[in-house]
Regions:
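Glycine-rich phosphate-binding loop signature in dinucleotide/nucleotide-binding domains
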Residues: 45-48, 128-133
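Phosphate-coordination/substrate-recognition cap region in phosphate-metabolizing enzymes
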Residues: 39-102
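Generic beta-sheet signal
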Residues: 5, 131-141
Length: 190
């Protein structure tokens, strides 16, 4: 049996609620974000994880702590996509100057390319697979979607097919050597 990777997207923030691209900006969870992060705890509490990792961003670290994982190891490679000049903007705002823009297909001035994000998350995949066990990660919408794509052997751009809400968990694993999605975008019960 291969490794199992449990992905948790951080709880809601004011910027995630507004659809603003939030990469480097370190912002707090909303009251609702704190509540849903706490509500994740029962779903994760009975699992014995071999490794627990978190993005260095406060919103991910706070979600980990509220879900009961105060000792999560910070992993810089789990940071959200660096949106460069588009930090804090919404997709409709960006499309005013770049019609049809998506993070998956267009350059991000002053930010990361899909290949750069993919390289970071490939290192996470390698680290998880090397454990051969259960690994829990707390991170962000775009970075987790890329991580899922790379786990499955798909191109970075295929991260676009994975919708991911805040304060949800997803489970990736292996079925007879084939990387698979076992659960996706499961929310806590409040």
């Amino acid at each position: 049996m291969g490794a199992t990777l449990v992905l948790v997207r951080h709880g809601q923030t004011e910027w995630s609620l507004a659809g603003r691209h939030t990469g480097r900006t370190d912002i707090e969870l909303t009251t609702a974000g704190e509540a849903t992060a706490k509500a994740l705890a029962p779903a994760l509490a009975d699992v014995d994880f071999d490794l627990v990792l978190t993005s260095p961003r406060f919103r991910a670290r706070r979600t980990a702590a509220l879900a009961g994982f105060t000792e999560a190891t910070v992993e810089d490679d789990l940071a959200e996509w660096d949106y460069g000049d588009y930090e804090g903007l919404t997709t409709p705002q960006i499309r005013e100057s770049v019609p049809g823009w998506t993070i998956w297909d267009h350059p991000v001035p002053g930010g990361e390319t899909p290949d750069e994000v993919g390289a970071r998350l490939d290192r996470v995949v390698e680290r998880v697979r090397a454990t051969g066990g259960r690994v829990l990660v707390f991170a962000h919408g775009h970075s987790l979607r890329v991580l899922a794509a790379r786990w499955l052997g798909l191109p970075v751009q295929d991260g676009r097919i994975f919708d991911l809400d805040t304060a949800t968990y997803s489970v990736l694993g292996d079925d007879r050597g084939q990387p698979v999605v076992q659960r996706w975008n499961v929310g806590p019960t409040l």
